[in-house]
């Protein structure tokens, strides 16, 4: 089965730095190691579902897909890289991967460092969560090398993560909360009334907006360059 490599994916030097902040050499390296990075993300997905096992046990089955946001993001990027290597037409998947890795890659470190703190969590696990999620944000900025971020594809990603935000922070349906439980929310009678919840919600919505802007900006700049 034919596959693609980094040499077939020419970087667009016209893109502004804020949509393509990584050095081209780093992008090329990531694309050459796409299979390895996809495998690492699959492993991260498995670990992530294990990490959420306690919260999932208390969540109705119908809402499970909305709870493990980070594992879903690593699953999206793994599938996106596989689709890239096999030259599949899956721009909607690439958009989901970009949104997920950027959003969760920045939301989790922010919440851990600013809202949660280490608490009783083992320091090794704490910093693993922070740094591994930063890595997700970095790999998000490789996706533009093979994605077009078409308007319909961005619409799919915006719908998915917009619905996630609504269910996680604003609509108490399906036996929530569905977001990653914050330390301040453990044992709380009304977790959505806490200030920590408001901060986490604001960060999530802002990052969904940021991902939408960056994806559409990438699409617009690339389209203008091709004219």
Predicted regions and their residues:
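N-terminal juxtamembrane cytosolic/stromal segments of multi-pass membrane proteins
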Residues: 1-33, 52-61
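Hydrophobic cores of alpha-helical transmembrane segments in multi-pass inner/ER membrane proteins
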Residues: 5, 71-84, 134-145, 201-219
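Membrane-interface helix-boundary motifs at transmembrane edges
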Residues: 24-28, 83-96, 145-152
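Alpha-helical transmembrane segments
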Residues: 30-45
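Selected alpha-helical membrane-embedding segments in polytopic membrane proteins
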Residues: 44-87
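Juxtamembrane "helix-exit" motif on the non-cytosolic side of transmembrane helices
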Residues: 48-57, 109-120, 166-174
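Membrane-proximal helix-loop-helix units in multi-pass membrane proteins
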Residues: 97-163
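Terminal transmembrane helical module of multi-pass membrane proteins
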Residues: 146-227
């Amino acid at each position: 089965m034919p596959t693609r490599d980094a040499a077939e994916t020419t970087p667009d030097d016209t893109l502004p730095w804020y949509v393509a902040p990584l050095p081209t050499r780093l992008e090329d390296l990531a694309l050459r190691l796409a299979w390895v990075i996809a495998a690492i993300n699959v492993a991260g997905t498995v670990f992530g579902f294990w990490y959420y096992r306690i919260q999932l046990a208390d969540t109705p089955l119908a809402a499970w897909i909305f709870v493990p946001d980070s594992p879903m993001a690593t699953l999206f990027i793994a599938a996106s890289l596989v689709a890239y290597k096999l030259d599949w037409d899956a721009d909607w998947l690439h958009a989901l991967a970009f949104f997920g890795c950027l959003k969760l890659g920045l939301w989790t470190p922010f919440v851990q460092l600013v809202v949660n703190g280490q608490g009783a969590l083992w320091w090794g696990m704490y910093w693993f969560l922070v740094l591994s999620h930063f890595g997700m944000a970095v790999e998000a900025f490789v996706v533009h090398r093979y994605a077009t971020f078409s308007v319909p594809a961005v619409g799919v990603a915006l719908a998915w993560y917009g619905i996630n935000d609504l269910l996680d922070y604003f609509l108490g349906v399906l036996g929530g909360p569905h977001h990653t439980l914050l330390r301040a929310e453990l044992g709380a009678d009304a977790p959505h009334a806490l200030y920590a919840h408001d901060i986490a919600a604001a960060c999530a919505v802002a990052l969904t907006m940021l991902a939408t802007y960056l994806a559409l900006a990438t699409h617009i700049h690339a389209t203008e360059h091709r004219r």
